[in-house]
Amino acid sequence: TQEKSTMQTNHKRNTQHLLVNPKQCIWGNVVTDNLLGVYSFFPTQSIDFTELAPFKKGLLNGGCGIVDDELHCIYVDDTYAAYGVLGVTHYAFNTDTWELIEQSLQPKSWNVIATETAIDPKTGEVFGEFYSANLKSLEWGVIDYRTLTRTTIAKAEHSYIALGITNDGRAFGVADDGNLYQIDRTTGVETLKGSTGINVKDEAENHFYQTGEIDPNTNEFYWAAKTANGNC
């Protein structure tokens, strides 16, 4: 059987440096001028996307996780953010049929918005970096997508754009400073492992949506990277 992991990706990309496990099937929220929805693909030099669920209502940009046979996602609509208004919607898809089975607005549930999430391949726990209830800080926590509640472990030191968990439970993430860190899932302590060599933020300190995932079979970290100038 093919192992599957989920990630959000923004573009058909050059993957000439991806040399690991070309049979690894990945699920992702693809957002391009021509493609919009949940797709599957393989990390090969020439990537073809297969549509699983058409989804044109927004981006799955606030975190996601698989619970049993359901893919749960958060969409954050920031159209009116300048006026202090954020739309938060919880979506769930059946991963056998890819039918949309849940769509619910979550007014004022800002603490379920994640910059990035990752699933423990052994326990199914969804660990991530989330906004605080007042949106003023970032914090590590564990979310239950069934009840839309989460814990708070500790304040986060960096803002993360890619996150994954190995098959022995270690969490790693790429922060928006372009560095790779290991995150202690109990204390939230972030330990620098090294630079990725990729410049993510532009001069205004902004960056594109992107994500990552760790293959639970090989512990290889896949990162759908997008540089500050928009290159994939």
Model regions: which residues?
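Structural motif
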Residues: 33-40, 80-91, 134-142, 177-182, ...
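Beta-propeller fold detector
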Residues: 48-57, 99-107, 151-156, 190-198
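Conserved beta-propeller blade signature
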Residues: 25-29, 71-75, 81, 125-128, ...
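Repeated scaffold domains used in trafficking and secretory/extracellular systems
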Residues: 11-18, 57-69, 107-121, 157-168, ...
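Loop/turn-rich, solvent-exposed surfaces of beta-rich toroidal or solenoidal domains
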Residues: 208-211, 222-226
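A generic tandem-repeat structural signature
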Residues: 78-141, 145
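An edge-strand/N-cap motif at the start of beta-rich repeat modules
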Residues: 3-54, 64-66
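Short loop/turn segments that connect beta-strands within beta-propeller blades
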Residues: 42-45, 93-97, 144-148, 184-187
